Amino acid sequence: MFQYLYYIWEEPISISLGNWLNIGDIIIPYGLSLDSLAMTVMIPVGIVTLCVLLYAIEYMSHDPNRNTFYIILSVFAIFMTILVVSDNYIMMFIGWEFVGVISYLLISFWSTRIAAMKAALSAILLNRMGDTFFMLALGIFLSYFHAVDFDTLSLAAPYTNTLILNILSLLLLLAATAKSAQLGLHAWLLQAMEGPTPVSALLHAATMVCAGVYVLVRSYFILEYAPSLLIGICWLGGVTTLVSGLIAIVTNDIKKVIALSTMSQLSIMVLAIGISSYDLAIYHLYCHAFFKALLFMGAGSVIHSYISETQDMRKYGGLVNYLPFSYTAILIASLSLMAIPGLTGYYSKDIIIESLYGTYTFSGYILYYMAVGSATLTSLYSIRVLYLTFYNNPNSNKATYQHIHENIRMLIPMIILVIYSIFIGFNRDNVIGHYAMSLPANNSFIETEFTLPWYIKLLPLILGLSLSLLLVYIYEYAYKVRPSSIYNYFNNKIYYDQLLNNVIIRKTLIFGGYLNTYIDNGLLKVLGSTGISRALTYINIGIFLNLLYLFFFYR
């Protein structure tokens, strides 16, 4: 309703609910900002949350704690809404913190699984690193600007020291890197697939992982005056989207492949932010939510149909006749992810890749070809998922296939998302026409739209389709299992987990042990009750009695 109001009156709706704190000249307001950016994000948040709740009613129907699950999922939707519609960074940080905490509860919902508990711990610890950088940014906002609301900061940004803006941009980028699973703080996203599939469909496709991108877009007035950081954002997105595609092409867990595709698409959004195309980034977020949630739901339908609930695609095969609607849903979502013309992904994804070339800079050219490589890999692993799951020869026993079936109540929300995955892309001009975020010197939309040669626009599509056909041919006629060192390198996720554990985690634990021994317990031994009692034992009792005598009789 609010989006329709905004489009009718062409002005944002601000609702002031009062002030939280008034300390000197620092005023922290409490209010809602229902502008075009917030409303564009609220549409997928609301629709996908509703579909996931309907889907979870059947998916979790046999779980004894299902009512708790529904409550936690609903509370998550509330705090995600607070994050999106807040009019200042403090209120946004509250939503940011709570969606992180609730994601821990949802990932570890099946608490009897050790892998799920470890995954939840990894998620909250890595996100806590991002929260730390966000808090540092809040401290700079309060100490330097004496304000945290978006309107005041956007007016002050053009007149602010460039060093301050660069530091703020870096802190917000690091916070977004953790929340949106960019390279360096991405390990938690794959491990989070241990949670229930409805959690993956909501948190790790449409809402929570997009929060980092949303914060960067909302902070456009800071990023626009920090051009050196924009280049860094571009390269972070380019490397992440390429690495995630290379890992996905050799991953066998169906949910982890989809999670890696989420990581890749988030990197495409980060690339758009790096070239100041904030409208394209938020529009891709808007479109991506629908077909990625559909992809997770389709995968959940496949997993739920197996007795063992296995996620290994090598144990699937021949399911096109057993799960026809799940096949249709995954097919449409995969084609949209591959940016096939006529589907939602084509209208939001390819224009970002074209815009990289449209910057006409050396970095833009390199990042364009990196993004084309990522788009090609996206087509390859999408076709690989379809082939191994539905077209390949059956790889499970007869009893498994006798019990495979689809549930009609799980299909209803998927039908809604199928419609959105096909038609929502036609609404592009109506959505992005309401943004005016980037500085004129940084805007490359006109060059992208009117000056690029045709082969630059069609290169991702041509490479993706041709190599996908080659992949199908290899699987049908020339497939041999010959793991190489390159295969093992990417199959082990570029050994990032081992590097993180051995270089950072172990050293941090040792350092924390020293701090606990010498600082925490050490202070207690010196200044606490133990230290006082030990000091008293060393005082001569005669001196103590003399002091008491002097105190009482000679005062």
Curated annotation (Swiss-Prot):
Functional summary from the UniProt entry:
Core subunit of the mitochondrial membrane respiratory chain NADH dehydrogenase (Complex I) that is believed to belong to the minimal assembly required for catalysis. Complex I functions in the transfer of electrons from NADH to the respiratory chain. The immediate electron acceptor for the enzyme is believed to be ubiquinone.
To which species is this protein native?
Candida parapsilosis (Yeast)
Q: Which gene holds the coding sequence for this protein?
A: ND5
Which keywords does this Swiss-Prot/TrEMBL entry list? Electron transport, Membrane, Mitochondrion, Mitochondrion inner membrane, NAD, Respiratory chain, Translocase, Transmembrane, Transmembrane helix, Transport, Ubiquinone
Q: Where are the transmembrane segments?
A: 37-57, 69-89, 90-110, 133-153, 155-175, 197-217, 230-250, 257-275, 287-307, 323-343, 366-388, 406-426, 454-474, 494-516, 534-554
- Top enzyme category: translocase
Q: Which domain of life is it from?
A: Eukaryota
The answer, when asked if Transmembrane is one of the entry's keywords, is yes
Q: What name appears for this protein in its UniProt entry?
A: NADH-ubiquinone oxidoreductase chain 5
Q: How does it sit in the membrane?
A: Multi-pass membrane protein
- Asked whether the UniProt record includes Cell membrane among its keywords, one would answer no
Q: Which family does it belong to?
A: Belongs to the complex I subunit 5 family.
Q: Which cysteines are joined by disulfide bonds?
A: none
| Gene Ontology MF terms | NADH dehydrogenase (ubiquinone) activity
Q: What is the lineage of its organism?
A: Eukaryota, Fungi, Dikarya, Ascomycota, Saccharomycotina
Location of the protein in the cell = Mitochondrion inner membrane
The biological process GO terms on file are: ATP synthesis coupled electron transport; electron transport coupled proton transport
Give the EC number(s) listed in the UniProt record. 7.1.1.2
The record's GO CC annotations read: mitochondrial inner membrane
Reactions mediated catalytically: a ubiquinone + NADH + 5 H(+)(in) = a ubiquinol + NAD(+) + 4 H(+)(out)
